[in-house]
Amino acid sequence: MIKEVIVVEGRADEARIRACRIEADTIRTDGFNLLPHTLEAIRAAYERRGIIILTDPDGAGERIRKYLTDKFPLAKHAFVPRKEAIANDDLGIEQANRDSILRALEQARCLQFEPQYEFTLADLSENGLNGTTDASERRSFVGAKLGIGYGNAKQFLRRLNGYGVTRDEWNAALAALNEG
């Protein structure tokens, strides 16, 4: 049983977690329709057990994640890569397979109050993650390897520093990128 409560967007996401036989309690936000009783349930879970935010890898999911992060700064974050959350012309956690969801939960990270400033835009540029025609795909791959999700260059840099990614993790992800 996962200690933290998993916060998902909708009923289909909850059903997917159950269908994958992941032993965890969930709370759904019903999209961005966060009613007071839902926020109170999330707050109670956050204070008692901790929460893992697992939203869809799309714009709406990122807005919900940001809103919840502002309210619950010590929440953990799990990211399923976009390419692993697409099926039947639909994008969402409910489309992801069990392995993708488990990997995202295993790699869940907490934002740090004192973000490190280990990485700069130069690191991204030197490794083809910014300013190249395939930078977006490269960031997507590295983000999936690191468990921090996809973002544009500026967002990606914030995640690298904010989620405490180490140089060793960075180097291993780049090595995997360059091998593939």
Report each predicted region and the residues it spans.
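Phosphate- and divalent-cation-binding pockets in alpha/beta enzyme and binding domains
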Residues: R16, R63-Y67
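Short, ordered loop/turn segments at secondary-structure junctions
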Residues: T29-F32, D56-D58, V80-A85
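Acidic beta-strand-to-loop metal/phosphate-binding motif
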Residues: V7-E9, Y46-A60, F79
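Long, charge-dense
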Residues: Y67-E114
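Acidic, glycine-rich catalytic loops of TOPRIM or P-loop NTPase phosphate-binding modules used
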Residues: E4-I6, R11-A15, A19-R48
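Catalytic phosphate/metal-binding cores of nucleic-acid and nucleotide-processing enzymes, i.e., regions
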Residues: M1
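C-terminal, charge/polar-rich interaction regions
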Residues: R103, C110-G180
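Charged, alpha-helix-enriched surfaces in structured cytosolic catalytic cores
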Residues: G59, R63, A96-S100, T133, ...
